[in-house]
């Protein structure tokens, strides 16, 4: 079953447009949504959540999103939360009347696990604690789909690792879907099963993370040698001392050129090459 199905999505702004022809999000997977600032990541997530009007077709759990859909969806979107003078108890009171399946015991268990101070107002919480509270609030009605927009942005490595670990616990049973945008690609690599790369409002790449890392590699060579490698060269970039090429079909390339050394390409390497490469 597909958790999300997108067809011919178009959202136009004055100086930008998002145009996604087809995108299907499988059930029970973690998907890392990557792209440069302004690429359209937040716009895509807000369209899925029906926070923007758009052209095209988006189905969540096989139907157009409606009020009852949010019983099965949890979301963390920047600059969208409760009144900053609220305390944790006030947040709980609102969540109890918002979601039929809200689990107050689970909420406080998670809050205690994160050592959340119950007596502080939201505007007195640290950035890390506020993000933890947002994530707890998003999952304590047991949603099947969790949408997170930059949940680890601006946080120190220890807090980010706590949040990633918490998300791992949430998905361990295998039936939850997470769509998770971040510009911190090391976080994406830790948790994602699939990578979705958006560039200038267009879907550039969508594949399993492990498959991507196996398919692509980086070759350091001279500019003169580039012509020898034909269609294996996807993108190139040059610096003062050498030319680097993003190679596709690495295993086949090594069979043709066994003496060439191809370095592993991580998700960040692939994104940078595809967005800025010279070829």
Task: Give the residues covered by each predicted segment.
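Conserved ABC transporter NBD signature motif
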Residues: 56-69
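ABC transporter nucleotide-binding domain
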Residues: 164-247
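ABC-family P-loop ATPase nucleotide-binding domains
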Residues: 75-134
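The feature captures the beta-strand-to-loop junction immediately N-terminal to the Walker
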Residues: 31-36
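C-terminal coupling/interaction segments
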Residues: 233-279
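Conserved beta-strand
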Residues: 6-9, 16-26, 56
């Amino acid at each position: 079953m597909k958790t999300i199905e997108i067809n011919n999505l178009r959202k136009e702004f004055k100086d930008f447009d998002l145009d996604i022809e087809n995108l299907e999000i499988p059930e029970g997977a973690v998907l890392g949504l990557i792209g440069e600032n302004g690429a359209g990541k937040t716009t895509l997530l807000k369209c899925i959540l029906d926070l923007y009007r758009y052209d095209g077709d988006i189905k969540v759990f096989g139907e157009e999103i409606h009020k009852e859909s949010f019983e099965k969806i949890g979301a963390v979107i920047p600059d969208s939360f409760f009144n900053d003078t609220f305390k944790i108890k006030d947040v709980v009171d609102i969540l109890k009347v918002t979601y039929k399946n809200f689990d107050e015991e689970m909420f406080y268990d998670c809050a205690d696990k994160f050592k959340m101070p119950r007596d502080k107002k939201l505007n007195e919480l640290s950035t890390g604690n506020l993000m933890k509270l947002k994530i707890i609030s998003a999952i304590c009605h047991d949603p099947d789909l969790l949408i997170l927009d930059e949940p680890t942005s601006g946080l120190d490595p220890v807090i980010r690792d706590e949040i990633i670990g918490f998300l791992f616990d949430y998905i361990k049973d295998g039936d939850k879907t997470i769509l998770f945008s971040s510009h911190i690609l090391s976080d994406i690599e830790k948790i994602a099963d699939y990578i979705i790369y958006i560039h200038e409002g267009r879907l550039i790449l969508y594949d399993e993370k492990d498959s991507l890392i196996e398919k692509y590699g980086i070759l350091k060579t001279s500019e003169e040698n580039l012509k020898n490698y034909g269609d294996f060269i996807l993108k190139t970039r040059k610096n003062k001392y050498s030319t680097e090429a993003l190679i596709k079909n690495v295993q086949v390339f090594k069979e043709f050129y066994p003496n060439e050394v191809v370095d592993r390409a991580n998700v960040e390497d692939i994104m940078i090459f595809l967005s800025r490469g010279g070829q």
